[in-house]
Amino acid sequence: MNDSRQQSLFFITLPDLNKLCAVRIILSNKVADTEIRTIQMKMCRQLLFLHQDILTSPVSGILNQIWVVMAIPFYKARKLNAYVEKYGAKMEAPQRVIPVILQNCLSYSFMARLAPAWNRTGHLLIQGRDFLSQMGKQSAVVLNINVTETQVCLSIEACTIRLPAPELKEFEISQSIIKDFHANKHAVIERHSILSNWCYVLPSMKMGQIINIFHAIPAACPFHSYGDFQRHWDALYGYKLPGDCGKIKIYCNIYFKMLGERTFTYPLSCIRSQPMQFFPRVDSEVVLKSFLSDLKSKLPHICGFPIKMTSKPCYYTQELTKPNIQEHKVKPPNLTTKKMLRASLTQATSRKPACAQSLLPCSVAVDHKVELSVSQPTSGIFSALHLQPESVQGRKKSLSIRAPQVHSEVLMPNRGNTQVQHTNLSSQSNITPKFVPVFKNRLLQMNKNTSVLGSPKRKQHDVTQSKLFSLKTSMIQHDKLNLGPAIKNRYSSNIQMQAANNLNQENSRPLQEKNTESSENMTKFPSSRGKSTVSLNKNKQLSNSAVFVVSNNNLGVVKSAVDFQMKGKENLTGKGITQILGKSHGSLKLKRQPHIFESDGETEDPRLLQQQSENQAKEVGTSDHRLIVSKIAHRSKRKLCPESSKTSKKHHSDTVHYGQSSSSKKQILDSDKSKLKKSLIIHNA
């Protein structure tokens, strides 16, 4: 059964459609409605057999129009004009051939040219010109045509059918009536005598109702003899009706409900009492070869252009689809789908001691490197763990900016300040690593705001920074020549502690101003890695010396530093005290410019500072060092007690009123400039 219903595919190469044209023929309006359909079908078949280089087809759904496809030279030859004028029809202007028009014309032309070898019956083409009189099985094919711009696909299915001619008893007519009907030539079987009056009418196999059955042709019928019926069926469908053979012919009036009350006269051989019967077929290749042979002989070319047709058939296959999937309609899994998950950017905190990282001004250049690397897309969630160590330090700098409350504890001026500072730094070094999410959009926005808002401030700070940088460098170099190695080290340690204190106060400033100055510092002082190491060594030495840290604007630091230096070195003159006082005032002016203290690190060689620290550690003994530290701590406690309350109050007022207006900041800068000039005058004197 599967072999009988297997479809074979053949392909025909089409000529260039631009070389063809389609013409619409409109029939005359004078033709009666009862004859319009007959004239349409007759003209189509007659044009096909008159001219072998054209294709024709009735316009679908319109009874008075015909499509004709031809080559452009054939149309210019005006070969159809005489025939069209004979029937009083009109021919419209030619138009471009599209696949739909060509498909209709090919379907009709194939069936018309193949008859009577293959006769259209319903959706089948039954083989044999005597198929109407056959009582047994017959060969047939199902032909479907699909047309594209370049080729034609023919789907051919071979089958076996049985379509026997009807007998009167099949319509449930009584035997006595049938006997009387055969005996009398003028007898008529009326409708009430036909119990089963439904029938199938060729060639469409549509169903109709039998109204009556008779031998003589009615006077109202357009055909007056059996020969007229033969010519009519041959002209319209290519059917070859059975011969006369001297037998009395039987006719039927058929009523079609869709066509109204009008009845149509058919020979009994052109109707069937039952539908077509299908049977399985084994030798389908024989039918295919016979059909293709007739097709090539009847249609050797298309509109005068030769065609190329495949000789071997192609078949549909379902081998690529599994039976269980086909039955249950289970969709196969999609292995190419990717889950769209957005990875969050993280950064890891370092386990290194946070002493130098929290107190030093940190590398601004490294900080900008980290922000640029974070702003770029990463390949995974933990890609931040593979950054360099300097990038981790830069990230801790950004974290200290976001959490200024940690540094505010270091700035508390109390008696246990050194212990509190040491415990805070040690607790920070013991913190376990954490993953802190970094938001790219926020960093990009901060960088954009910094670049836009920092441009007017750069011009203002460039002049003051250049002057103060030159003055401060000369003061430090001159001071190093007069002071001893021990006092020189302590003096530089005080400067670095003041720089660290300025950095801690700088963290409480707005983030926008912080980023502005850091971007300036990156452009002016790119060598930040060397400064970090020097400051780290000095901070270690500073923690051993137990020097108290207070705010820069407190003069108690200056007094304690002077007393400490007088004890260490007796030949310290008032010139050095004046330089230290000027230095403290300079640091007060540069309170919001921590990068100037970074420039001090550039004037001093890092290797020289390391050698000095090592020599000092060798010269001073452990016992003497402890004795000096205890004396200094006792003396500084007595002097700092009345001033600690003032310092705390002033620090509180500074933290509360750090967002003051720009006018008050300018006044403070002017006052600091005047103090710095006075100290320089005393120094020169």
From Swiss-Prot:
Disordered: annotated span: 502-538, 635-685
Transmembrane segments: none
Biased composition (Basic residues): 675-685
InterPro entries the record matches: DUF4708
Pfam family, one: DUF4708
Polar residues bias: start-end ranges: 518-538
Highest taxon in the source lineage: Eukaryota
UniProt cross-references to PANTHER family, sorted A to Z: GENE, 17266-RELATED (PTHR28495:SF1), HYPOTHETICAL PROTEIN LOC100359752 (PTHR28495)
Name of the protein in question: Uncharacterized protein C18orf63
The species this protein was found in: Homo sapiens
